[in-house]
Amino acid sequence: MKDLLLYIARNLVDDPDAVSVTEHEGDQELTLELRVAPDDMGKVIGRQGRIAKEIRTLIRSQAQRTGTKVSVDIVD
């Protein structure tokens, strides 16, 4: 999941070297924290959060194939 999120985020932003993803495993859920450069935050979130919603949808659909529950947090 982490690699997929990195791939998606790096292709959306102007500064792909500033993209990082941190994994946090909970009891029943894996949380991925996405960090990007402040100037690229709008590109990852999108108008009215549409891009962020689609990123979360893609990651969740991939996680369902492996039977995992995943949430994506975009951290500034």
Summary of predicted features, one role per range:
Residues M1-K43, I51-D76:
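RNA-contacting regions in translation and RNA-metabolism proteins
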